[in-house]
């Protein structure tokens, strides 16, 4: 059965992402995981970090990958399938690589449920739009928006992966202590890993030139930017010798 594009759920999903991003800024509190786990009640149920991240991120890969699996296989098919493939690439890494290498603290179960719901909804939104709604001109692969967007996506993913590697090296298996991250973009900002992911989704929004991707990029900027800000405050409070020239998210600016 052929699926027809319906604009109403696309608009509703995009509006929800924008609202969630704005809500994160309005509340202005860090999500209670990682460095900020203490913000939750001690009795809160927690899962090991690796299992938690795997379960939370899996829908963002499985849902769009399932949609892609129903499409004809082609390396350079319709732009929507290629762009959704980039989305799947990011979440393949987050689900099957990042989660298994994670050395973080146990993750609150309530946040896993929220994260899983978000990842499922966003995976459906991005996949549905790109496969069933998006229309691109014949020359989209040579359009500057596609080229620059894919470049930013790959650049951001590289920054994100490299920054996560630096963070993992700060802690031996079983350790829960914190150290000052050094190297890479951590030389300039406290949230280098967050900056990389924000760049990724800005690139994705540019390459797809779509409302759902733009809404997701806005949400990522709000949520991850706020988390970078709180990480920066955490480091300044914990380490007296923390580099004063280092910013939270944007080198030399913020």
Swiss-Prot record:
Give disulfide pairs as residue numbers.
none
This entry carries the following GO cellular component terms, namely: cell body fiber; endoplasmic reticulum membrane; neuronal cell body
**InterPro entries, alphabetized:** 3-oxo-5-alpha-steroid_4-DH, 3-oxo-5_a-steroid_4-DH_C, SRD5A/TECR
One MF term in the entry's GO annotations: 3-oxo-5-alpha-steroid 4-dehydrogenase activity
How the protein sits in the membrane?
Multi-pass membrane protein
What pH dependence is recorded for this entry?
Answer: Optimally active at acidic pHs.
Q: Which GO terms describe its biological process?
A: androgen biosynthetic process; androgen metabolic process; biphenyl metabolic process; bone development; cell differentiation; cell-cell signaling; dibenzo-p-dioxin metabolic process; female genitalia development
- What UniProt keywords apply to this chain's record, in alphabetical order? Differentiation, Disease variant, Endoplasmic reticulum, Lipid metabolism, Membrane, Microsome, NADP, Oxidoreductase, Pseudohermaphroditism, Sexual differentiation, Transmembrane, Transmembrane helix
Q: Cite the effect that the entry attributes to residue 89 to V.
A: No effect on affinity for testosterone; no effect on affinity for NADPH; increased Vmax
- Function summary: Converts testosterone (T) into 5-alpha-dihydrotestosterone (DHT) and progesterone or corticosterone into their corresponding 5-alpha-3-oxosteroids. It plays a central role in sexual differentiation and androgen physiology.
Which disease does the UniProt record connect it to? Answer: Pseudovaginal perineoscrotal hypospadias: A form of male pseudohermaphroditism in which 46,XY males show ambiguous genitalia at birth, including perineal hypospadias and a blind perineal pouch, and develop masculinization at puberty. The name of the disorder stems from the finding of a blind-ending perineal opening resembling a vagina and a severely hypospadiac penis with the urethra opening onto the perineum.
Protein name per Swiss-Prot or TrEMBL: 3-oxo-5-alpha-steroid 4-dehydrogenase 2
The organism named in the record is Homo sapiens
Q: Which gene encodes it?
A: SRD5A2
